[in-house]
Amino acid sequence: TISWHGCGSLRLAYSEDEMDWLRQTLSVGSALGFNIELVGTDQIARLHPFYNLDGVLGALYTPDDGHVDPSNVAMALAAGARQLGATIVRRCRATSIRPAADAGWAICTEQGDITCEHVVNAGGTYARQMGEWTGHVLPMTSMTHHYLVTETVPQFEDLKDELPVIRDDQQVSGYIRMEQKKCLIGIYEKTNPNTVWEDHCPWDAENELFTTDYDRIMPWLENTFERMPILAGLGISREVHGAISHPPDGNPLIGPAPGRRNYWCCCGTQIGIGWGPGLTRELARWMVHGSADV
């Protein structure tokens, strides 16, 4: 099981410029066959009666959207890969990558060397320093992201259906969704971002988390409580403050790296759980057939 919650999502717009962007996204999504529609405040209120819609002009509603447990997805993908013949070696750090004599690649690891025809740099926060092994300069940095989980929300207790995820870039700088009968608030600090590991991510870091910086996120948290007043009097049951790799333009670094045959990048994917399946499918097609379908 991957714990999929198909609750849908609403991406809000507060200005005509934002509405134009939603219309453009609607056009692209509809052309690709997605179930997606532009809705007004009356329908938003029906879908999510606890959200303050002052100033909201409309939203992009994606009924088939939702959220999922990333660790469960990773385990399911690993199981599928093993069924197709892949070997996954855990607790085995790569220490260098170098060209092999047969025009392939030699990867040195803590458990011995591996030779291969293709190599994919999917190193996450380590991708930049791994790229240095082969002379590649990958433009990316690690920026921190908070999410907080409230105590149980009394108004959620009797809900039959899960509320749609709210994506409110202007007021929350992130997203708000149900976490069972609690509420999860994810904040991307776009006006005062914080970077870590400017030189290199420590090799011994594992699920590295940082102290919650309430001073930095407080303006967004206050906005959240104004938008969802039912959360204002609740305590916080869980705090998470971790690093995510970001390229300068927000787009993933994917495809063949220049100057090196059969060296591929799949990194800088700041929305890993959302982009991962599609990006890796297209990268695999690119590697096998010489081009992607998009």
Can you name each region flagged by the protein language model?
Residues 6, 40-41, 90-92, 109, ...:
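Short loop/edge segments at beta-strand edges and connector loops
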Residues 17, 48-56, 98-106, 246-250, ...:
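A short, glycine/Asx- and small/polar-enriched loop/turn
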Residues 2-11, 45-84, 199-208, 261-268:
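Helix-loop-beta segment of a Rossmann-like dinucleotide-binding subdomain
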Residues 70, 171, 180, 194-195, ...:
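C-terminal catalytic lobe of FAD-dependent flavoproteins
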Residues 97-211, 222, 227-228:
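Flavin-dependent oxidoreductases
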Residues 5-9, 143-145, 239:
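Short Gly/Ser/Thr- and Asp/Glu-enriched loop/turn motifs at secondary-structure junctions
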Residues 60-118, 126, 277:
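Helical element adjacent to the flavin cofactor pocket in flavoenzyme catalytic cores
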Residues 1-47, 171-176, 180-184:
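Dinucleotide-binding Rossmann-like beta1-alpha1 core, especially the glycine-rich loop
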